[in-house]
Every structure is written in structure tokens, then in C-alpha cells.
Amino acid sequence: MTKKMRRVGKYEVGRTIGEGTFAKVKFARNTDTGDNVAIKIMAKSTILKNRMVDQIKREISIMKIVRHPNIVRLYEVLASPSKIYIVLEFVTGGELFDRIVHKGRLEESESRKYFQQLVDAVAHCHCKGVYHRDLKPENLLLDTNGNLKVSDFGLSALPQEGVELLRTTCGTPNYVAPEVLSGQGYDGSAADIWSCGVILFVILAGYLPFSETDLPGLYRKINAAEFSCPPWFSAEVKFLIHRILDPNPKTRIQIQGIKKDPWFRLNYVPIRAREEEEVNLDDIRAVFDGIEGSYVAENVERNDEGPLMMNAFEMITLSQGLNLSALFDRRQDFVKRQTRFVSRREPSEIIANIEAVANSMGFKSHTRNFKTRLEGLSSIKAGQLAVVIEIYEVAPSLFMVDVRKAAGETLEYHKFYKKLCSKLENIIWRATEGIPKSEILRTITF
């Protein structure tokens, strides 16, 4: 089978770990230090075509400004003649949303810890004049120690000098404040606080406070703050949530008030921000202003005769998500996205089965180089869902099928994945089927 080696400057780039409309995020390793990183890759042609230069500049600048232990760190920005590479901290614990899906809902003590860390991160952003505007569990990651990391500053805003109100409607509808939906000017700080309240409700309840199958109905509920807390919520957390989900931004509780709340303060240990470092924006200017000689070397070797061979350092980072628990020790409290499975069928047979099942579910499929994209309506018929499926060889005649969301609601994606797997039982391999651990370890490439 074929093996892919790709280098971008000092980074050895591996598999795709995330994909959106305008960018891919790939796992990579710094060959100088051996550290793992995530690299967000964007085509310059796409950025120019969609007039996103200012937005990308803003996202990079903001991530350089807001350095905090509970915010994903940006290391550097690189460029080739055709692409931009944003090198980020690699967060290994998956999304907070994955933990909610795995457990159904979280206990108050665990929810409180995550909420405290979220509020600390948001407060740090606000003191720097930055408003996130797209806070939701999918943008909250967990590290190996279970600490929260805020990510995805693509919709963030820095207010213009002398302008106190923001006017652009951004974010995921279920988490957006009423004043944002109104289309009038709004205070970015108050809007972020509302989103934090929705997140707190979701991690405690396991479902959204505001949910409808049509947008007008959803907007009506949000504008009226029409929700009810389940019976397992304590009186103290109910009181705090109602103060946060106040539809009037002028009377809504502020960060300082949240930090004084008795429920919030229980076992609260404030996180200190990283020591102030001089913010250097020269690499951003170099990337976007096309300074001569600023390009990083990019080297790709690939033929398309078979799936990518996954090497050892990629396998290790995936070990806790794979259903190959006999290979590696596994922490029982470690939850990572597990929307992937293993098969011993030929790649062409795997793809044919996936396409047939997807078509029966009403999804269109497009396959190239052992990578399949599926597109269709989500189960609630309220929006599009796009899924990317890629096959990797992890050992001779043993293939990992990685399934990830490219667009759409995360909860709908998990429903889709469960249904897809239930229809692919004939090709999914279980570890009990008898391949020795020693055989797999011996055949992983280094």
C-alpha cells in the first residue's frame, strides 16, 4: 500500500482531524521538538474568492492577543505560494460535546468545573476587548487532564474604536442571544454571557433549552427566554441560569456577578493568564501581504493506488478513539470522539458499502482517493449535514475508517453515525475476531 509523507517547513503533516467549508485541520509533528500540533490549512484562492482576508487576519490576530491556559494557543502562521497554515496547540481530549454525548449529561460538580474554566477564558477575552460570538460545546475542547480549551475564533470581533455595539448576526442559532437575532446593535460581552448560560444548561441537562424544528419557532422561544429546567437541577444552579438567560441584555448578569454567585464559587480556583508576551504580527503581514521570500517549503509525496498508510505517531494519537483497546492502555475517564471503525474488508468494498447505505439514507456521495463526502438533509429536515469518510491502512489487511462531520449540527451528526454503523455491521471488524496484538504492533510503520 502507499505511504504519504508531507512536510510543511519543520512540520511533518499527517491525517485530517477536522474539516469545514473553508479549511482543513491536520495532525502534525514538529520535527525539531517532537511536539504534536494541529495545523489549520486554507487555500489562498478560496480566501480571496470568498473575500475572507480580513476575517482570517482578525482570527489570527485575536488568537495571538488572547493567550490563556483555557484557550487553544496559536504558535505561528506560515504560507506556501498557494496555502496558509495556522499552527495551533493540539488538544487531545476531544470536544466537550463528545463527553456530553457519551454520558448523556454531566454531574453538577463536573459541570461547575468546566463552567468556571469557560467563564475564566471568556472574561480574559473580554478584558482584551475580544468577543467570541460563537460559543458552543463543539468549540470547547478538553486536554488530557480534562481541562477546557476554547477554540475557533473565526467569528470573533474586536470593536472599532469609539463603537460600543456590534451589528453582525453570528453564531449557531440555538446558542445566540435574543438581541443578536434582532439585527440591532448589541453588546458582545452580554451576548457571550448568554451563550455561556446555554452551554451550562446543555452540559447539565443533556439537551438544549431552546429547540424547535423550524427557525421562526426557535427564534420565538429564544426571544421570550421560554425554557424550563429539569427536576435534577439544584435550586442554586436554576437561579444562576435564569439570571444568565435573561432576554434583556441590560439586566442580564455580567461576568463579575457570575463570579460572585455562590454556586459558581464552590471549589473555584481562578486561573492565571499566561504572562504577557509581546504580540508580534509580522508573520500575519508576511502571509497576507506577499512579502518576497516569506514562503515555507512544502513537500508532498503521494500516489493514489491505495489508502494512506498510517504511521506510528498518528496511531498513538488515535489509540484511545480506536476500538482496539488491547493495543494500548486506556484511561476510563478519557472520552474522545469515537466516530471511526475498523474493517478487514478491501477498501473498494468498504467504499461500495458506505455509498450504498448512504444513498439508501437519502445522502449523495462523491469519492476520490479513498475519501468519500456525503451530503444530505439532517433527520429533523432543518439543515444540511455533510460527512467526510476517509480510509487508512493501520496494518496489512486492517483498515481504519474515519468518519467526521464537515457541516451541520453535531447532535444530528452523531445520530447519523449510529444509523450508518448499524447498517454497516457486515464490514465492521470487532477486536474479538482474533488478530493478535503482537501482529498489529509489529506491522505499524515507523
Swiss-Prot record:
EC class of the enzyme, as a word: transferase
Originating species: Arabidopsis thaliana
Induction (record text): Up-regulated in roots by salt stress.
Name assigned to this protein: CBL-interacting serine/threonine-protein kinase 24
Mutation effect (residue 168 to D): Increases kinase activity
PTM per Swiss-Prot/TrEMBL: Autophosphorylated.
Lineage: Eukaryota, Viridiplantae, Streptophyta, Embryophyta, Tracheophyta
Compartments reported by the entry: Cytoplasm; Nucleus
UniProt-listed Enzyme Commission number(s): 2.7.11.1
Domain Protein kinase: 11-264
